[in-house]
Amino acid sequence: MESIGDAVGVVIPGASADVAVTGISLNSRTVEPGDLYVALPGAVRHGADFAAQAIEAGAAAVLTDDAGARLLALSSDTSVPVLVVDAPRNVVGPLSAMIYRSGQDTAPQLFGVTGTNGKTTTTYFITSLLRSLGKRTGLIGTIEILAGGDPIPSLLTTPESPEVHGLLALMREKELDAAAMEVSSHAISYQRVDGVLFDVAGFTNLTQDHLDLHHTMDDYFATKAELFTPARARKAVVTVDDEWGRRLAGSAGVPVTTLSTSRANPADWTVTETVPRGLGTEFTLSGPGGTVLAVHTGLPGSFNVANAALAVVMVLAGGVDAATLQAALDAGDPFTVAVPGRMQLVCERPAAVVDFAHNTDALARALEAVRSPEPDSRLIVVFGATGQRDQGKRPAMGAIAARLADTVIITDDDPHDEDAAAIRADVLAGAREAQEREELPCTVLEVFPRDAAIQRAVELARPHDTILVAGRGHEVWQEVKGVNLALDDRVELRSALTARGFNVLQDDRIES
């Protein structure tokens, strides 16, 4: 306890200084004996209101602010030391690193990926490539957490700081060699990766999203750029296909390796040739000193070429030589790994795909990726927009769907506490305005609830058509007015296809 007091500038009196602290928690319901309970101010209640439960569960001490201390002074139970600091959130990350000993010079080697789109797939690609290299790996991300064993469900793209450091400590105990982590802008803003030092940080792209949090693209960029500073990363790999990547490459505070998927944007590594192969792509990656790597990804879309290329260059930046990496690419085909809810194929005829595309850029790329070359094939898309999020992207998503699909079925995503009909109306307005202004030949429908929309898409589909169900990907719950309703797009799509007599693909990750 004394070392914790020293770290936050608080003197621990008497015998309390010898109290052992073995963990840290922000949630009174997850406190274990020996934990430091951090009582933070919340949107409705202060964490200090729940200190009694934390102490009863075995909390060794409480860390809070002045407001929390005043609430604790009213409590009859002050049997544990109380540490008071001005901004407790600011010290949670460093304290977590100290308590779990997950600081700068400890294993595993850590790869962090940020950007608007592609974080999940890139971290899966990194993990798969590292495994092909014979390394034991971990993963922290939107879909799951892996620590060398069975998958652990994840509710946040990046968990809270104590959980992140606890997971890194667990990975060290399991003697894992490396881990890949998604790093969202929310995680940086809410200090969930404070105290974490990434060996290699990677940047995918930046497009409109999360402006409900960041308000402007400049603010959004500034948050992402915080990852590329000496306090958070040793090296960086930056994709410079967009202006934000080029800006980041020029301003990052750590050594940068650049990557481009086009010769139009000069970079250290460039995708120089692409050849379609099945659903995926074979491509060459040309780098310094005339180095050329032959790479294949089995996932469709030019964006997955970018994701695979970023994974390759990040692993190279992590210290693997090009010849060893090429051998792993040849032997393991690591970028054909299935990523749940990311361009996930449920049926081949009709082609039926579920993808997480939930913003304008991702939806456009997904629609372009799944469009069949068959001249008589129609593209049917089912999607909606999330409630209580950036409202400006709703009509833009509707317009993009109208331009790129033959049949647009607008439905509900996660309304949260917003009116679902109002959200649909925003998306519909964009689709119908584009349809009228640009004289687009598409059909625009409004169908709800979401399972009915998926059924309608299947009813309309012929064997040579394509169905894209976009926006939710791997998610298995739909939040409506504070209630979580069971809803998995993959399950609904498989069920509707089966009912119509189509042969669906088997996947043990889809629980039908």
Task: Mark where each language-model region is.
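Short, conserved loop/helix-junction motifs that constitute active-site signature segments
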Residues: 55-57, 75-77, 194-197, 227-232, ...
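Short secondary-structure boundary segments
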Residues: 64-67, 183, 205, 240, ...
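ATP-dependent carboxylate-amine ligase
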Residues: 1-13, 17-20, 30-36, 42, ...
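Short, basic phosphate-binding NTP loop
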Residues: 1-114, 122-133, 267-268, 330, ...
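Acidic, Mg2+-coordinating active-site environments of NTP-dependent enzymes
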Residues: 69-75, 198-351, 430-440, 507, ...
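Residue-level signal for inorganic ion chemistry
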Residues: 4, 35, 54, 95, ...
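Phosphate-binding loop of NTP-binding sites
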Residues: 91-240, 244-253, 504
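Well-ordered beta-strand positions
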Residues: 36, 61, 200, 235, ...
